[in-house]
């Protein structure tokens, strides 16, 4: 029996970037492992044969190998399916790839913006992503016909009440259709975990308590409990019904896509 609206497909694992909080970086050490495109297409075609019109490409970063992704998109396009995935902001600078991704049916990409503060990006070893570029990245991706979802972190050492207020305003003004937040978490095995252990800043070592909505790190500006409070403060502001309706139902780009509007409205309600 067909359950749901899409199924997952994977083309590759890993990411060439080495963000110090990331488990993918910890596992794959900056490497990207790709599957044979024929095998990936076999899986996508099977998803379609089961009656699904959409799939979720669960790769960690679809621009890890641009040429590979370009060829995959060319193969996907004739199937006339819709799909979702996540990638790094470099896709906005690759016009050919961005167009191919959009033309092949992709309608939403999730980006790990992490922070709008440059010093924070240095701290997490993600200097290749410049917060000054975020608005232009979103504009280019939207222009291609793809909605932008985002993932951002709360509780980096540079975070203050003022920087988090600025983050709220950034999300409100930037056309992000589905903003998601996570507390900065020292997952065992990551560079972040090693550093925080050495500094004695982890307030709870029970990994069963590690979740996006609860901080276990004390920062220069907040205790772990205060970071958790800030997390929920940001959420209450950005996930008020007024904010959800503004970026979904009353989003001008959604006028021609009523079912997509309902999908994103539902996603926001779940978040």
Predicted regions, residues:
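Radical SAM enzyme core and accessory elements
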Residues: 193-271
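C-terminal structural cap/anchor segments
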Residues: 163-164, 177
């Amino acid at each position: 029996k067909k359950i749901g609206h899409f199924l997952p497909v994977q083309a590759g694992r890993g990411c060439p970037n080495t963000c110090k909080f990331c488990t993918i970086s910890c596992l794959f050490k900056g490497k990207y492992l790709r599957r044979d495109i024929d095998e990936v297409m076999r899986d996508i075609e099977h998803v379609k044969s089961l009656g699904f019109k959409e799939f979720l490409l669960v790769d960690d970063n679809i621009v890890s190998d641009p040429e590979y992704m370009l060829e995959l998109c060319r193969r996907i396009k004739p199937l006339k399916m819709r799909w979702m995935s996540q990638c790094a902001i470099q896709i906005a600078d690759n016009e050919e790839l961005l167009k191919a991704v959009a033309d092949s049916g992709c309608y939403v990409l999730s980006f790990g913006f992490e922070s709008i503060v440059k010093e924070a990006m240095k701290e997490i070893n993600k200097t290749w992503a410049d917060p000054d570029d975020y608005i232009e990245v979103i504009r280019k991706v939207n222009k291609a016909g793809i909605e932008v979802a985002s993932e951002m972190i709360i509780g980096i050492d540079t975070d203050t009440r003022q920087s988090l207020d600025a983050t709220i305003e950034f999300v409100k003004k930037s056309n992000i259709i589905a903003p998601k937040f996570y507390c900065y978490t020292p997952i065992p095995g990551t560079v972040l975990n090693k550093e925080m252990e050495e500094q004695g800043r982890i307030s709870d070592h029970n990994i069963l308590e590690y979740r996006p909505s609860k901080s276990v790190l004390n920062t220069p500006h907040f205790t772990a409990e205060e970071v958790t409070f800030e997390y929920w403060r940001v959420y209450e502001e950005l996930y008020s019904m007024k904010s959800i309706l503004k970026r979904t139902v009353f989003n001008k780009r959604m006028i021609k896509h009523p079912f997509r509007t309902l999908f994103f409205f539902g996603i926001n309600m779940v978040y």
